[in-house]
């Protein structure tokens, strides 16, 4: 059975849970509490050196990054399809997904926000300012 290491408030992990459930794939959810720093503990880092969620374990292999995991799920369980079959339509969907994961998500990511307000000593308005530019 697949094992999904995730955090309930992680939008990246949520994307993978949606894909797994839409495809009807059974999986075991292994919570990783990001607020308590469980992703930084040796036990988790030994499995996933990135220390991020989600991570999907399948037959001893560890997959990371939500869009890569979703692409894997689409390949091994093509029905029902999550992505259009037409290459141009598929490219448009991927462009939208990449906009969310690369442009929007980082500005709302807890790890990024802590870094901005911690080591960089930026105020809480910094993400809003960055989003407008």
Task: Label each residue range with its predicted role.
Residues 1-127:
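GST-like domain detector, emphasizing the conserved glutathione-binding G-site
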Residues 127-133:
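Amphipathic alpha-helical packing segments from all-alpha helical-bundle domains
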């Amino acid at each position: 059975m697949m094992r999904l290491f995730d955090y309930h408030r992680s939008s990246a992990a949520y994307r993978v849970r949606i894909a797994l459930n839409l495809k009807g794939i059974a999986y075991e959810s292994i919570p990783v509490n990001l607020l308590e720093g469980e992703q930084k503990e040796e036990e988790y880092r030994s499995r996933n050196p990135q220390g991020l969620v989600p991570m999907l374990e399948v037959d001893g292999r560890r997959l990371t990054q939500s869009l890569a995991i979703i692409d894997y799920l689409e390949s091994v369980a093509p029905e029902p399809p999550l992505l259009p079959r037409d290459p141009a339509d598929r490219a448009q969907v991927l462009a939208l997904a990449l906009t969310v994961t690369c442009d929007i998500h980082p500005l709302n990511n807890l790890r990024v926000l802590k870094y901005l307000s911690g080591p960089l000593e930026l105020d809480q308005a910094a993400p809003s300012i960055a989003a407008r530019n």
